[in-house]
Amino acid sequence: MQQRSNRRSCSYIPLGVHNNAEKSLCTEVAPARKNKRSITTSPIVNINVVERRLFNLELEKQQLRAKNLSENTGGGSPNGGAYLDAKKGVREQDQYQGGPSKELDRLQPPPSMKKSPPRKKKSLKDLIYETNKTFYQVDSNKVKYKVGLSKKQLLPSKTVDN
């Protein structure tokens, strides 16, 4: 075979023996090119592109789960059947993982969503007293510091130079 005089170099790969034919049979193969995109693009990856791709992968996984659930139910009611099957799938996954079922956690709202008890209005003086009580031992006029500091340590020390 003749090699074309092209600016691209072609690589020749010897083929194995076919039907006991010639051992030195060679065929021309397409030129070994590197990925053009990897050559032309910068090595810095745009974070937004990666996030979008990951998000799309998550969407695809969810769509596949929905298809699998709908196939398993046999075309039952889309609302109730799929929901029950989803719970069943979650339970099975938990059993495989060996962990406890997290179904109870899902039924209860997170602590941040729970309503806090109604607050009582307190005077500023009472609030200051309570905060001081946590950090200091307050006893009428005497204040002992719980942190281990005394008033002398808090005041800047004065040095007397003669």
From Swiss-Prot:
Task: Please provide the Gene Ontology terms (biological process) for this protein.
Answer: DNA recombination; DNA repair; negative regulation of DNA recombinase mediator complex assembly; negative regulation of mitotic recombination; synaptonemal complex assembly
Give the location in the cell.
Answer: Nucleus; Chromosome
Compositionally biased spans, kind Basic and acidic residues? 85-94
Tell me where it mainly resides.
nucleus
What assembly does the database describe for this protein? Interacts with RAD51.
* Protein name, per record: Meiosis-specific protein HED1
Q: Show the segment(s) annotated as Disordered.
A: 67-124
Question: What's the stated role of this polypeptide?
Answer: Involved in regulation of meiotic recombination and repair of DNA damage. Inhibits RAD51-mediated recombination when the meiotic recombination machinery is impaired.
Q: Which GO terms describe its cellular component?
A: condensed nuclear chromosome
Keywords, ordered alphabetically? Chromosome, DNA damage, DNA recombination, DNA repair, Meiosis, Nucleus
Where does this protein come from, organism-wise? Saccharomyces cerevisiae (strain ATCC 204508 / S288c) (Baker's yeast)
Q: Which GO terms describe its molecular function?
A: enzyme inhibitor activity
